[in-house]
Every structure is written in structure tokens, then in C-alpha cells.
């Protein structure tokens, strides 16, 4: 007979994900145990296994849910009928808002994905690649000379992406700069230089 799920199954499952993300962000995946996750949830270890059989399953679901939601939000941001620069602003604002509001999950994604089995890690990387590709498309519209349609991603998208993802190792949304202002600063810092950039190779070294 198939077991009937309780009405609050999804809520309890999400609560476990939230508590585990906070624990992993603070102590690291490797330094945390399922017993500690259960204690953080105010539940028994056996109760936890009703939702997640292994710690790796818990880690995968934390990063999968986080990055899938982020991808959905970013697709909405860049698919609006707006000029490319405005869609770029929306992309950065959306990325910053998600990172600021899901800082634990973001840190777990950055620091602990290496502990996932290969197949699950590849699945997460594919989602990350789609997020970067959205950015590449918008940057191509802003400055096709620097981002030719048939070229590889190039340094520009990855420079910006790297800058944004590492922001949340130090940024706290409760600090002096709110997320929306931070996003505007990032957008302006990057796009004003990128839009007018014409690449000139450095002069040969005399050494």
C-alpha cells in the first residue's frame, strides 16, 4: 500500500532544507552531520531520513532548488520587452536579490558542490551554464564587437559573474547598502565601461 503523505509534508521538507542550508553555510557540509541537522530541526534522526536518505541528497536538493529558482527568475528578467541595458540591470538586480535573500543556499552552492556525486554535480553545472548564457546574450546585444555571437563566452561575462557570486561571501543585506542599491552600483560599474569598450591588445613587453 502506498504511504499517504501528510498535509504538511512539503512544509516540513522545506524547513529541513532551510535549517540544513544554515548549518552547512556555517560549518561546511563536511563538518556537519545528519544528527546536527535533525537537532536544528527539533526532530529525530530517523524523522529526517523519512525525507532525505543521505546527507548528499540533502545537499543536492538545497543547491538544486536554489539554482532552479534563480534561473527561472533570471529568465523572466532578461526576456522582457525592454532595451538590452535595462534587461542587463534587471539581470543583476535579480541575481543580487536572490543571493541576498538566500545567502545560506548561495554559500553552500559555492563551497560544497564539490561533495556531490559526479552526476548530480554535472546537473548543477548545466543549470549554472544556462544562467551564464543568459548574461552572455544580453552582453552581446549591448556590445556585439566584444561579444561576437559565435565566440566563446569570453572573459567579460565570466568577470561579471565571478564578481557577483563572490559578493555574498562578505555582503549582508542588513548592512548600509540595500540589495537594490548594490545591484545598481554593480550594473553601472560594469556596463558603462563595457558599452564603450574597444579592445586594444597590450603593447609587447620589452623584457
List where the protein language model places each region:
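Basic, helix-initiating cap at the start of DNA-binding domains
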Residues: 1-27, 32-40, 57-60
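Amphipathic alpha-helical segments used for helix-helix packing
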Residues: 100-119, 169
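Short hydrophobic/aromatic patch on the recognition helix
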Residues: 41-52
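C-terminal peripheral helix-coil segments that are non-catalytic and often amphipathic
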Residues: 1-2, 97, 101, 132-141, ...
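Hydrophobic alpha-helical connector segments
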Residues: 61, 75-101, 157-160
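Short, hydrophobic secondary-structure boundary micro-motifs
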Residues: 107-110, 148-150, 172, 201-203
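Short coil/turn segments at alpha/beta junctions that flank glycine-rich nucleotide-binding fingerprints
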Residues: 26-30, 81, 102, 145
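Amphipathic alpha-helical packing segments from all-alpha helical-bundle domains
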Residues: 65-75, 104, 118-144, 154-158, ...
Amino acid at each position: 500500500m502506498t504511504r499517504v503523505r501528510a498535509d504538511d509534508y512539503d512544509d516540513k521538507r522545506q524547513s529541513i532544507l532551510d535549517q540544513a542550508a544554515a548549518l552547512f553555510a556555517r560549518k561546511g557540509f563536511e563538518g556537519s552531520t545528519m544528527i546536527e541537522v535533525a537537532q536544528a530541526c527539533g526532530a529525530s534522526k530517523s524523522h529526517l531520513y523519512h525525507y532525505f536518505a543521505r546527507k548528499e541528497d540533502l545537499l543536492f536538493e538545497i543547491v538544486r532548488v536554489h539554482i532552479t529558482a534563480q534561473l527561472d527568475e533570471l529568465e523572466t528578467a532578461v526576456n522582457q520587452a525592454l532595451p538590452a541595458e535595462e534587461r542587463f540591470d534587471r539581470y543583476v538586480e535579480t541575481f543580487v536579490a536572490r543571493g541576498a535573500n538566500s545567502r545560506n543556499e548561495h554559500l553552500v552552492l559555492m563551497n560544497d558542490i564539490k561533495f556531490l556525486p559526479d552526476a548530480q554535480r554535472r546537473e548543477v553545472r548545466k543549470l549554472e551554464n544556462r544562467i551564464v548564457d543568459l548574461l552572455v546574450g544580453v552582453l552581446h546585444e549591448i556590445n556585439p564587437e566584444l561579444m561576437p555571437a559565435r565566440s566563446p563566452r569570453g572573459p567579460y561575462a565570466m568577470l561579471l559573474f565571478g564578481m557577483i557570486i563572490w559578493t555574498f561571501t562578505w555582503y549582508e543585506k542588513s548592512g548600509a547598502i540595500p540589495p537594490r542599491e548594490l545591484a545598481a552600483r554593480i550594473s553601472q560599474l560594469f556596463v558603462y565601461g563595457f558599452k564603450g569598450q574597444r579592445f586594444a591588445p597590450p603593447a609587447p613587453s620589452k623584457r
